[in-house]
Swiss-Prot record:
InterPro entries, alphabetized: Ribosomal_uS4 (IPR022801), Ribosomal_uS4_bac-type (IPR005709), Ribosomal_uS4_CS (IPR018079), Ribosomal_uS4_N (IPR001912), S4_RNA-bd (IPR002942), S4_RNA-bd_sf (IPR036986)
Subunit structure: Part of the 30S ribosomal subunit. Contacts protein S5. The interaction surface between S4 and S5 is involved in control of translational fidelity.
GO molecular function: rRNA binding; structural constituent of ribosome
Similarity annotation: Belongs to the universal ribosomal protein uS4 family.
GO biological process, one term: translation
A GO term from the CC aspect: small ribosomal subunit
Chain ranges of the S4 RNA-binding domain: 97-158
Entry protein name: Small ribosomal subunit protein uS4
Role, per record: One of the primary rRNA binding proteins, it binds directly to 16S rRNA where it nucleates assembly of the body of the 30S subunit. With S5 and S12 plays an important role in translational accuracy.
Disordered: annotated span: 31-53
PROSITE patterns in UniProt: RIBOSOMAL_S4, S4
Organism: Polaromonas sp. (strain JS666 / ATCC BAA-500)
Length: 207
């Protein structure tokens, strides 16, 4: 299955929430109206979505948010289920540990898609070694850096400037001048993705 290359705001409207796919970290109201689904008439009133429909929608939302396709998402779920603790939370921890997501969280890319491009184009190093695999799992203490020749790219400097304005999450420590950061820890569940109900995804895969 190929990645979706159409309008990004349309996906956010379909899920009813900002997936942070389009441009950097602007407010939802600045991007599009997410209270109606795409299409001529938008959301149909008076209809009730089935439990299965709600579960499927939540899975689609998280897949699109992190830019992961079904086969890989299923593997992540199976890994999360094998780990100790809450399966749903474990799934989100795995997604948050992807290199492309960490690059995004550190402010080197204004969207996860842009961060994924930086990784794929060999603009990112992990502990001094070039890594061009977006799904690479970052570990606590890993140092993520933008390679010297890429630091002055407009998209990188603009993303860092924006990150400076809106702030960075507590689980990363970034030196913007050096273009590098440390992944301090896997975030606690209450530190991110407040609008995600991962239990629905667990219910879906447990059918």
């Amino acid at each position: 299955m190929a990645r979706y290359l159409g309008p990004k705001a349309k996906l956010s409207r379909r899920e009813g929430t900002d997936l942070f796919l389009k441009s950097a970290r602007r407010a939802i109201s600045d991007k599009a109206k997410f209270d109606s689904k795409p299409g001529q008439h938008g959301r149909t009133s008076g209809t009730r979505t089935s439990d299965f429909g709600l579960q499927l929608r939540e899975k689609q939302k998280v897949k699109r948010m992190y830019g992961v396709l079904e086969k890989q998402f299923r593997r992540y779920f199976e890994e999360a289920d094998r780990r100790k603790g809450n399966t749903g939370a474990n799934l989100l921890f795995i997604l948050e540990s992807r290199l492309d997501n960490v690059v995004y969280r550190m402010g080197f890319g204004s969207t996860r898609a842009e961060a994924r491009q930086l990784v794929s184009h060999k603009a990112i190093t992990v502990n001094g070694n070039s890594v061009n695999i977006p799904s690479y799992m970052v570990k606590t203490g890993d140092v993520i850096a933008v390679r010297d020749k890429s630091k002055k790219q407009t998209r990188v400097t603009e993303a860092l400037e924006l990150a400076k304005q809106v702030g960075l999450p507590a689980w990363v420590d970034v030196n913007a001048d050096k273009g590098e950061g440390v992944f301090k820890k896997v975030p606690d569940r209450d530190e991110f993705a407040a609008d995600v109900n991962e239990s629905l995804i667990v219910e879906l895969y447990s059918r």
